[in-house]
Amino acid sequence: MTTTPTDRKYAASHEWLTQDGTVGISDHAQEQLGDVVYVELPEVGREVKAGEAVAVVESVKTASDIYAPASGTITAVNDELSGSPEKVNESPYEGGWLFKLDVTEEGDLLDAAAYEAQAN
């Protein structure tokens, strides 16, 4: 398990959000999912509310909804995941990001220490 980066905030549902609006899932979440085989990403331009299911990550074990950690508009998606969904496992905090949001309001988010405490 990698160290939880402190440069972002976390939702209790295991998504992370950076200051520039990039969203992904935590290392803890990708470990629980197992090998990711498919990622269904939201449409660019979609308006979402914090806590709304906006994407799906499918693994060999299960499919899991991904929730928006903040309200806003989807501005970009990580198109590389369509051909390489394993990036979610290999690099959950960098190359495995899912989508970007133009944030209008953050949801109920935790700092890294609080997230680690509740995730373990």
Swiss-Prot record:
Binds 1 lipoyl cofactor covalently. Its cofactor is (R)-lipoate. Residues 20-102 form the Lipoyl-binding domain. The modification N6-lipoyllysine is found at K61. It comes from the Bacteria. Transmembrane segments: none annotated. Keywords: Lipoyl. One of its GO terms (biological process) is glycine decarboxylation via glycine cleavage system. GO terms for cellular component: cytosol; glycine cleavage complex. HAMAP family: GcvH. Belongs to the GcvH family. The glycine cleavage system is composed of four proteins: P, T, L and H. The glycine cleavage system catalyzes the degradation of glycine. The H protein shuttles the methylamine group of glycine from the P protein to the T protein. This is Glycine cleavage system H protein. It comes from Deinococcus radiodurans (strain ATCC 13939 / DSM 20539 / JCM 16871 / CCUG 27074 / LMG 4051 / NBRC 15346 / NCIMB 9279 / VKM B-1422 / R1). The lineage of its organism: Bacteria, Thermotogati, Deinococcota, Deinococci, Deinococcales. The gene is gcvH.
